[in-house]
Structure formats: C-alpha cells, structure tokens
Regions:
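A short, structured beta-strand/loop element
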Residues: 2-41
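Long, charge-rich, low-complexity alpha-helical segments
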Residues: 25-70
Length: 70
C-alpha cells in the first residue's frame, strides 16, 4: 500500500497531526491502543473509519522503518 494512502498530514486537520488518510483519527491512537494491550480489533471497532488494511499497512511500514534504522 502506498504510504500516502495510509497516513496524511494536513494543517487544516487536527493542526497537522498525522492521521489515517481519509479520517480524523490520529495514527498515534493506534499505537496508544496497542501499547495499552488492546488488540487491533478493539481499535478498529472504536474507529470504524480506519480500515484494517490501513492499520496493518501502518504497522508494517513502522516496523520496516525501525528495522531499517537498526
């Protein structure tokens, strides 16, 4: 999935906070849920505007960047 289709940054949306593209859901919120021990399905139920494909692609991209920097 194209990274531009996963997360977008627009100064008019939440002051430029990175959000899942096409939503007003901050990408950080997914990480907060996972850090709290909540499964991906709980996040997706709470934020139905974020698709499973977007969430998984975000996590894959984040992992790829972390591993590339290691």
């Amino acid at each position: 999935m194209n990274p531009r289709l996963i997360v977008s940054v627009d100064p008019e949306i939440l002051g430029g906070t990175p959000v899942f593209a096409g939503t007003r859901v901050p990408a950080r919120t997914l990480l907060d849920y996972l850090e709290a021990g909540d499964p991906l399905d709980v996040f997706l139920e709470d934020f139905p505007t974020v698709s499973r494909q977007q969430a998984v692609a975000f996590l894959e991209e984040a992992a790829e960047r972390v591993l590339a920097a290691a």
